[in-house]
UniProtKB/Swiss-Prot annotation:
Disulfide bonds join 70-84, 125-135. One of its GO terms (biological process) is symbiont-mediated perturbation of host programmed cell death. InterPro entries: AltA1. This is Effector protein PevD1. The gene is PevD1.
Length: 155
């Protein structure tokens, strides 16, 4: 019995040691100068009965912004890239895969240099009057933006 337990422990221990590390894992923490965490709060979309987006707004907080208002009237879906106020932050609204809406965020850091990333926003939609629907963010959301190329699309 002791031999069986020892053999099993050795076998499972060896297989755990032989397991490959996750791709791209070097063990070192990521360089904080190579990415930015963007917190999204108070995300709201007003859409018509036909699904057209009439208005989108949210607050963005990142390295160079705290509660920056981002908004657009009749942005379309997907939207063009829209500047948040007079800042170097921009966004585009699109359809998500898991949730109804996704945000692509951009932070211009210099001439043709910046961070970019996309994340989905979990919303709940309800009647908003005059045949419209109001969709509001349900959970705190952080989108990580960086200068790395996007991962290949899944087949």
């Amino acid at each position: 019995m002791q031999f069986t337990l020892a053999a099993a422990a050795a076998l499972f221990g060896a297989s755990a040691l032989a397991a490959p590390a996750s791709p791209g894992s070097t063990g070192a923490p990521p360089d904080p100068n190579m990415y930015e965490n963007i917190d999204i709060a108070d995300f709201n979309v007003r859409k018509g009965e036909d699904g057209t987006i009439k208005y989108v707004n949210f607050k963005l907080s990142g390295d160079d912004a705290d509660g920056l208002l981002c908004e657009a009237q009749n942005p379309g879906l997907p939207s063009n890239v829209i500047t948040c106020g007079e800042s170097k932050y921009r966004f585009a609204l699109s359809s998500g895969k898991q949730y109804e809406f996704a945000l692509s965020l951009y932070h211009e850091l210099g001439l043709a240099v910046g961070f970019y990333g996309t994340g989905e926003i979990f919303t709940h939609c309800r009647a908003g009057g005059l045949g419209d629907f109001i969709c509001q963010q349900q959970n705190p959301t952080t989108i990580v933006i960086d200068s790395l190329p996007d991962a290949p699309a899944e087949a």
